């Protein structure tokens, strides 16, 4: 049975439905909406999920007895896709102790209820304990389902309030897709790996650190992959300044993978300065003409140096400065890549620049296609590894539960045998040695 709210403050009213039959009351009366302009900290859940007023009727959801399957009770919340609002957080006051929230089939989170009050239900003539629980969604959504959980096989659930916090959605936010990797919870992956007793290889750990840095700084991971896989450093930094300009691939496609080359902390500053000097000067004193023809190299030394610092600050989780004591392990991947590009950076003559300009369109297309294929391949690998780790973890849990069940069954069987035959020792227990203290005729005991 589907119902709608009657709150006039919102132009697009969300719908609320239940997988169980509504035996008493209406879900419309239990749904309370908060205005979209409020933030999660601007309202008090204690007040919104306060005990109901005396005499207030509760909504009763009953299990369908015609359905033999033991389906749990689900609540379905849905907003119109063109309503301009999304669900940001949910709170429920009901007899169900806990609730789980799902976005489609994807688990979102669990909220454990707190005892609020005890009310007397006139229809059932029993005391009902109401629990309050609330959950803030990591990302707002147009639709979600709520699983109500209770101890024991409850045949009905009493609902007092369903509080939904709505958030305004801008027109451009619906068309923008989330950054690659933002949907992957790396902390969860790390926890699963540690629980299985596994450790990440150095390469996998570097990849995870790079994705975590991208999630934290909201940097398109394609730019990081282009930098790591051999894009020229100065064109990568120009791409940071103008999103419409893409760097071309370095001619030296056989450049060693940056993580395999050696780098010491003593020559970091020297390599950076060398890179800046080479990037701002062309041989033969033809700086102005070749810069105009190629339209690639920046004309200002300080401008390029600032771009270099900004690129490093955006790539690393910590701010890069001249006096910062950042561990070498954090600077190593980016600086190795930068220095390897400096060693293979050769500025050609005028004909080479003209050739670069002629093939500029083809290389831009190649960069875009390669970035797309690399990002797609990386996402598939991460998703496959997460599914594999989750399957191994579930198999391990099932095995442990099975062993525990067998152990409990053995103990119960032993206890029942002992109760049925109290005088006979149970099977598997060695007999105790009793000494009567009597001596034999030969004096031995």
From Swiss-Prot:
Enzyme class: hydrolase
MF term (GO), any: identical protein binding
Primary location class: cytoplasm
UniProt cross-references to InterPro entries, sorted A to Z: PAAT-like
Subcellular location: Cytoplasm; Mitochondrion
Recorded superkingdom: Eukaryota
Keywords per UniProt: Cytoplasm, Hydrolase, Mitochondrion, Phosphoprotein
Region feature (Disordered): 426-445
EC number(s) reported in the record: 3.6.1.-
UniProt feature, compositional bias: Basic and acidic residues: 432-445
Record PTM Phosphoserine, positions in chain: 177, 182, 254, 302
UniProt GO cellular component terms: cytoplasm; mitochondrion
Family matches, as Pfam families: PAAT-like (PF14958)
Reactions the enzyme catalyzes: ATP + H2O = ADP + phosphate + H(+)
Quaternary structure and interacting proteins, as annotated: Homodimer. Interacts with ABCB7, ABCB8/MITOSUR and ABCB10.
Family annotation (PANTHER family): ATPASE PAAT, C10ORF188 FAMILY MEMBER
Function: ATPase that regulates mitochondrial ABC transporters ABCB7, ABCB8/MITOSUR and ABCB10. Regulates mitochondrial ferric concentration and heme biosynthesis and plays a role in the maintenance of mitochondrial homeostasis and cell survival.
Protein name: ATPase PAAT
Origin species: Homo sapiens (Human)
């Amino acid at each position: 049975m589907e119902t709608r709210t009657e709150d006039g403050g919102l132009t697009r009213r969300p719908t609320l439905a239940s997988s169980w039959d509504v035996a008493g009351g209406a879900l419309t009366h239990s749904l309370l909406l908060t205005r979209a302009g409020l933030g999660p900290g601007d309202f008090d859940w204690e007040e919104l999920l306060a005990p109901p007023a005396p005499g207030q009727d509760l909504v009763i959801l009953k299990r369908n007895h015609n359905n033999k399957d033991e389906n749990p009770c689900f609540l379905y919340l849905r907003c119109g896709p063109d309503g301009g609002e999304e669900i940001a957080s949910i709170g429920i006051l009901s007899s169900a102790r806990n609730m789980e929230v799902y976005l489609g089939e994807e688990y979102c989170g669990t909220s454990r209820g707190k005892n609020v009050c005890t009310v007397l239900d006139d229809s059932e003539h029993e005391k009902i304990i109401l629990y309050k629980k609330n959950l803030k969604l990591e990302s707002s959504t147009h639709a979600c389902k709520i699983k109500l959980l209770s101890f024991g096989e409850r045949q009905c659930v009493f609902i007092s309030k369903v509080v939904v916090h709505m958030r305004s959605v801008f027109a451009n936010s619906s068309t923008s897709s989330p950054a690659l990797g933002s949907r992957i919870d790396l902390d969860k992956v790390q926890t699963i790996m540690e629980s299985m007793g596994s450790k990440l290889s150095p390469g996998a750990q570097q990849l995870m650190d790079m994705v975590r840095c991208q999630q934290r700084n909201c940097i398109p991971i394609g730019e990081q992959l282009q930098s790591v896989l051999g894009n020229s450093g100065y064109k990568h930094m120009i791409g940071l300044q103008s999103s419409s300009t893409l760097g071309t691939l370095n001619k030296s496609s056989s450049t060693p993978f940056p993580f395999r080359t050696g780098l010491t902390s003593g020559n970091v500053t020297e390599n950076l300065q060398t890179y800046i000097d080479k990037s701002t000067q062309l041989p033969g004193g033809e700086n102005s003409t070749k810069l105009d023809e190629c339209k690639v190299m920046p004309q200002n030394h300080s401008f390029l140096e600032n771009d270099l610092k900004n690129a490093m600050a955006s790539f690393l989780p910590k701010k890069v400065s001249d006096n910062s004591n950042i561990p070498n392990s954090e600077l190593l991947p980016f600086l190795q890549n930068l220095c390897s590009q400096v060693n293979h950076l050769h500025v050609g003559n005028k004909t080479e620049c003209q050739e670069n300009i002629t093939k500029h369109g083809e290389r831009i297309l190649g960069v875009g296609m390669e970035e797309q294929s690399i990002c797609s391949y990386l996402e598939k690998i991460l998703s496959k590894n997460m599914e594999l780790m989750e399957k191994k973890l579930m198999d391990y849990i099932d095995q442990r539960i099975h062993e525990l069940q067998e152990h409990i069954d053995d103990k119960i069987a032993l206890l029942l045998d002992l109760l049925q035959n109290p005088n006979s020792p149970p099977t598997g227990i060695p007999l105790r040695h009793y000494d009567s203290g009597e001596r034999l005729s030969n004096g031995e005991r």
